[in-house]
Each structure stands twice: as structure tokens, then as C-alpha cells.
Amino acid sequence: MKKMLSPRTMLITAMLVFGTIGLFVRNIPVSSGELALYRAVLAALMLGLYFLVTKQKIGLKSIGRELPLLLLSGGAMGFNWILLFEAYKYTTVSVATLSYYFAPVIVTLLCPLLFREKMGLKQWICFAMSTLGIVLITGIEDLSGGSSHLKGILFGLGAAGFYATVILLNKFIRGVAGIHRTFLQFLAAIAVLIPYVLCTTGINLSNVDGLGWVNLLTVGLIHTGITYCLYFSALKELPGQEAAILSYIDPLTAVLISVFVLGETMTLVQIIGGVLILGFTLWNELGGEK
């Protein structure tokens, strides 16, 4: 993979693929919890095959020490997917994605509490402007409890909260890293999501038609399995700031897909809100941790 594609090309490809996931999720007729479970299963199978082909091994001793954190982070990853998929149901793909990209702001807010890091003026400005961006994409006229649009944004922010939890827990997991850690988190997500799905909606694969199967396999194998391989292979080779900049191809792609493929509209105010969220979260990442 490394010989065929440059690290920059791998990351750009991964971000472009990540940005199209909403298009496929919309056409899979199962619950969000069930879809998250299948995504984890298919991705784990794909990564397991990748490890076999590349002859990579994961140290069992390191797994034992990190097991509680891996279970917690894997569970958070699973529920992060569930809430993001729910967000796609209630609002546009672009607004759901922009809400989801509030995750770095949540991490910035919690790091001082967990790691005794100080928030400087720059971090406070980024928090304030990103929050303003969320208010703008919500729309003042939609701030009512019965609004489907607002419900979608809340699901997106909930997904951002769980994703921020995964990021923060990863800082405590030191024995295993990168794609190996993600593979173990997929397994942990499966362990958490199986009882959740059985206790809620149950298994409903009989509802999935031919197109649904194509979309499901695409989300699990391509958007998660293959694309995670590209993503982590690229991260090992690229400088942190370049990776941070290129990662914003994901939400930009999602917005373009939402508007030009799905025909979903964005008002000028929502566009300004999206620019505030993405612009200030990117600024917060640049010049930070390397």
C-alpha cells in the first residue's frame, strides 16, 4: 500500500471516502444500533485479514493491561456511530457532519480538567467561535424542542461527545497504538453493541434488500476497514499539522455531497456557521500538539 500510494495521497483518499459515508448510511434499512454493530464486525474482519496478509501481531500482554480502557473506548466508539447515524436521519448530512466536528472543541475543554493543561486565549476564542457556529447552523427559528432539525444537531453533538471520549481515552492507552488499537476497539464495540442491539431492535437483516447490502458492505468494508488502513498508514508518515489540515477534506466532502448529490440546502447563515466551526477547530489544532 505504501509503495503504491504516497502518504499524502492515502490520507486524502481516506478523507474523501469518509466524507461520503452519509450518502450510503441513508440507504440501509436497519436501526442505527444494528448498523453500528455490522460496521464494527465488517471492519474487524477486514483489519484482521489485513494483519494476516501483512503478518502483523498484537502483543497479548499489552492487551491485558489495557483491557478496561479498550472496552470503554470501544463502547464509546460504537455509540458515537449510533448517534451520528441518528443525526443523518433527522437533519441534513452537512449539518450532522458539522455538528460532529465539534468533537475537537470538547477535547480542548476537557484536557485542562484531565491533564492539567492550561487553556490559553487562543483556545477560548476557538471554543467561543465554534459554539457560535453551532448556534448559527441550528438556526434561531429551529430552537424548539419539536424541531427534527434541532434533534439531528443534538444527535450530532452527542456523537461528538462520544468521539471526544474515544480521543481522550486513547491518551491513557499506551501499550497498543494506531491501527492495532483501533482493531481492538472494534472488537470491544462488537462486545458492547451485541447485547445493546439484542435488547433494543434485535437483528433485522431480512429487511435489507440488494441495494441495502451493497451500501452495508461499502460502509463496513470500504468506509471503515480499508479506509482505516489508509488513514493510519498515512498518519505514521505525515507531519501532524499537514495531517490536521488534510483531515478537513472529510467534512468539506460531506457538505458538497449533501448539497450537490442529495440536493439538501444550506442557508447563508448555516454556511457561515460551518466555516466558523471548521475554521476555528482547525486553527486550534495548528501549532498545538505535534
What are these regions (language model features)?
Residues 30-79, 106-110, 162-166, 183-201, ...:
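Transmembrane alpha-helices of multi-pass small-molecule transport proteins
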Residues 96-102, 169-190, 224-260:
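Helix-helix packing/entry segments at the starts of transmembrane helices
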